[in-house]
Amino acid sequence: MGVIGIQLVVTMVMASVMQKIIPHYSLARWLLCNGSLRWYQHPSEEELRILAGKQQKGKSKKDRKYNGHIENKPLTIPKDIDLHLETKSVTEVDTLALHYFPEYQWLVDFTVAATIVYLVTEVYYSFMKPTQEMNISLVWCLLVLSFAIKVLFSLTTHYFKVEDGGERSVCVTFGFFFFVKAMAVLIVTENYLEFGLETGFTNFSDSAMQFLEKQGLESQGPVSKLTFKFFLAVFCSLIGAFLTFPGLRLAQMHLDALNMATEKITQTLLHINFLAPLFMVLLWVKPITKDYIMNPPLGRESVPLMTEATFDTLRLWLIILLCVLRLAMMRSHLQAYLNLAQKCVDQMKKEAGRISTVELQKMVARVFYYLCVIALQYVAPLVMLLHMTLLLKTLGNHSWGIYPEAAFPLPVDNNLPANSAYPELPSPDGKMKVTVTQITVALSSLKNIFTPLLFRGLLSFLTWWIAACLFSTSLFGLFYHQYLTVA
């Protein structure tokens, strides 16, 4: 069935499903409109008049007249008014007015489609074990990551358009902080953080040098280690800046969800969900993984509990389970955000003075209209973690089995095919075969340059970095909302 075969059929079927079925059955829409989320409606001006004890006024002498029309003063009411907001379940009609709803729906539904394609491809590879096919599910995962980063970039740019500049300063500050943090992490020896980045880069550099030598080119390598780490740190600083406000918002929703939760099991799950990025970070700390998990000290001797391959598999499964937990707790966090409308009204009642009815209505309505922005800030990091883990499993040559039958060897053989390996076919009909052979040899050379060692080190670091950024920003947000703001 060609170069891609069955995988191409799966991709075409999924594209058809996205076009025909998802507009009618959408997970993104169901997460918001399943009846569990309730939003607060802003009161009408007539209701506010009745609560304030004011009657509908006609034209009075106090009204100022400009150019033939009457300009009424804005209606104001006391801030300590006895106002109780009415709630309503989120419906599909309500979502039409939400900011960023199309982006939210596209990201979630495309992620679901990409995950299904990945699962089908994994089943296909486990049974058929093809060796000459391109794994097209990797393209889907890369597209998901690109869409998630694009959405986070779009949300971050809005903070730079605000005239006050407070949010812009926060993004820039955290960006520089994460750049310094990334440079510090990249110079730490692998005795503490076992990404395998040093080994992977060394293997990549040696393979690239050997490939260039076989092409008759003299080179000391494609890029120096310092340059590689510098550009990687710049990329990490951008990721950290994009994840700044999602982490800060998560901290506020976590505190509100804890106050809203009444059952102990819900509170426990909320705590685990908040600490999930920390658990992911600790999975790559070598003193913990090597000394206490893989080789726990039992008496005077340390007994090997599992192999490195088994621990790598357990690490993948744990990250996926924590991602599933975060998705399951999404409803609690979004409802905690929607409750901010009533919380703002309660806070207003404690203040003295008056407020215009228009400002009050905007204050209440603004919470619901930005629901999808908050949902994107919650979902996008989750999507990045999940599909970065899937890429790590496939490109890093890991296994899903806890006890694999045989270890998956990492190809480190640098014997690359030479230029003269192309067979010469003098007949004109053989030109197509020559082209196919050249493409095959080129792909084989690329596989020998970009080895699983490189992908394992790079993707392990990026997965760890996303979790570290989330935990750092959410921890700062927890401290800020708990101690630096007035409740």
Swiss-Prot record:
Q: How does it sit in the membrane?
A: Multi-pass membrane protein
Q: Where in the cell is it found?
A: Cell membrane
Q: Which UniProt keywords apply?
A: Cell membrane, Glycoprotein, Membrane, Transmembrane, Transmembrane helix
> Transmembrane among the record's keywords?
yes
Q: Where are the transmembrane segments?
A: 107-127, 136-156, 169-189, 228-248, 265-285, 305-325, 367-387, 459-479
Null mutant phenotype: Knockout mice are perinatal lethal and isolated embryonic cardiomyocytes exhibit arrhythmic calcium oscillations.
Name of this protein: Transmembrane protein 161B
Query: What is the organism lineage in this UniProt record?
Result: Eukaryota, Metazoa, Chordata, Craniata, Vertebrata
What gene does the UniProt entry assign to this protein?
Tmem161b
